[in-house]
């Protein structure tokens, strides 16, 4: 649920959630999203900005960092990253033609996240970090409550083929990133591994 901004402009970094579910862009003054999570290869961003907010930047702002520069040149101020744009095109076609659009994508993502959260809610070893009303369907954070056991889990998970589960430095523990491209089968396999780890270490 969006906050009541009382007339103030709402700016949102949607790098982790962009295209994971429908979004009413008119609710925002500016949306910024790195494409590397759900849209394409790293090295490109998508910006959706209200025209009246483009305005005049501060004098010291480098030309390439000005939204005005890119808006006035239709994002062609310099040579665009053609390969990244092409890959994004393929992802968008997949999302539309194979998945069935953003509502269908959201359904997939909610179901995937539920597999993991349902296990965490029942687990006697693992505990989710986020409050239920604030849970992400893209990044699931969890801990065992023991830093050494967390490290053991990350190590054994990597050996079993579950990589990049080490948690963000601000939270610690573990983080399972289950972006659009992650199939439900991948989450199911992770839950199976977590169940076995709990049985071996509880």
PLM features: residue spans?
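Catalytic PLP-binding core of fold-type I/II PLP enzymes
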Residues: 1-26
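Generic non-transmembrane alpha-helical segments
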Residues: 119-123, 152-161, 193-200
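PLP-dependent enzyme catalytic core of the Aspartate aminotransferase-like
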Residues: 159, 168-202
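Conserved PLP-binding catalytic core of the aspartate aminotransferase-like
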Residues: 126-157
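Short beta-strand-to-loop capping motifs
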Residues: 49, 142-146, 178-180
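Active-site C-terminal subdomain of aminotransferase-like
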Residues: 30, 35-117, 131, 200-202
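General beta-strand structural signal in soluble alpha/beta enzymes
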Residues: 10-14, 32-34, 164-167
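A short linear hydrophobic-aromatic micro-motif
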Residues: 125-129, 161-167
């Amino acid at each position: 649920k969006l906050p009541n901004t009382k007339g103030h402009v709402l700016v949102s970094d949607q790098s982790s959630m962009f295209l994971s579910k429908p979004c009413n862009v008119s609710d925002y003054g500016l949306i910024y999203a790195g494409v590397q999570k759900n849209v394409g290869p790293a090295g490109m961003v998508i910006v959706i900005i209200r025209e009246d907010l483009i305005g005049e930047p501060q004098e010291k702002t480098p030309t390439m960092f000005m939204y005005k520069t890119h808006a006035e040149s239709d994002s062609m101020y310099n040579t665009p990253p053609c390969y990244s744009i092409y890959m994004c095109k393929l992802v968008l076609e997949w999302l539309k033609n194979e998945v069935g659009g953003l509502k269908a994508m959201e359904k997939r993502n909610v179901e995937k996240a539920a597999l993991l959260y349902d296990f965490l809610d029942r687990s006697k070893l693992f505990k989710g970090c986020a409050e239920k009303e604030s849970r992400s369907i893209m990044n699931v954070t969890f801990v065992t409550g023991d830093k050494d056991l967390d490290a053991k889990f990350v190590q054994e998970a990597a050996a079993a083929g579950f990589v990049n589960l080490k948690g963000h430095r601000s939270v610690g523990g573990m983080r399972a990133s289950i972006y659009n491209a992650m199939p439900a089968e991948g989450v199911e396999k992770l839950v199976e591994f977590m169940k076995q780890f709990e049985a071996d270490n509880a």
